[in-house]
């Protein structure tokens, strides 16, 4: 089983699309959405979707702590053997996850890091301000 941690902040438009796409591609996944958005709380909507755990944090604590909180919660599920962290804005393409998971499993790896800064990588959906 795969645990996918998605830290979010003001990702109302993407969060549902991304989670549905991931669950369609990966039937053995549990998604942990760690949301720092103060004005929205999607807990009600996500409790209706199987294999999604929504964590709403009251204050914006930052991306790093959102990932750590997600990992802490996900690691309590002993069925999860592989942990993945993805951005909510589709800058990590859901379709590429399978290829990376295959490399991880076939390579008998303990850790696999993908980087958007490799020569063969592309950055999608980023404004010029974010790239700078």
Model-derived segments and their meaning:
Residues 10, 36-38, 61, 70:
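Conserved short acidic donor-positioning loop in nucleotide-sugar-dependent glycosyltransferases
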Residues 10-24:
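Short, well-formed alpha-helical segments that are part of the catalytic scaffolds
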Residues 79-91:
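Short beta-strand-to-loop acidic/aromatic patch adjacent to the donor-nucleotide binding site
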Residues 19, 28-38, 55-57:
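Short beta-strand/loop segment that forms part of the nucleotide-sugar
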Residues 1-3, 30:
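Cell-envelope/extracellular polymer assembly enzymes that use nucleotide-activated donors
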Residues 35-43, 90:
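A conserved acidic beta->alpha catalytic loop
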Residues 22, 70, 89:
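Residue-level signature of catalytic and energy-coupling elements of molecular machines
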Residues 57-74, 94-132:
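Acceptor/aglycone-binding surface of glycosyltransferases and processive sugar-polymer synthases
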């Amino acid at each position: 089983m795969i645990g996918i941690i998605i830290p979010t902040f003001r990702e109302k438009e993407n969060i549902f699309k991304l989670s549905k796409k991931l669950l369609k591609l990966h039937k053995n996944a549990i998604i942990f959405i760690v949301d720092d958005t103060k004005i929205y709380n999607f807990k009600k909507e996500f409790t209706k979707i199987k294999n999604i755990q929504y964590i709403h944090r009251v204050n914006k604590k930052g991306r790093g702590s959102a990932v750590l909180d997600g990992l802490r919660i996900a690691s309590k599920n002993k069925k999860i053997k592989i942990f993945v962290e993805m951005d909510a804005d589709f800058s990590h393409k859901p379709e590429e996850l399978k290829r990376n998971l295959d490399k991880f499993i076939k390579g008998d790896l303990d850790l696999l890091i993908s980087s958007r800064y490799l020569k063969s990588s592309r950055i999608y959906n980023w404004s010029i301000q974010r790239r700078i």
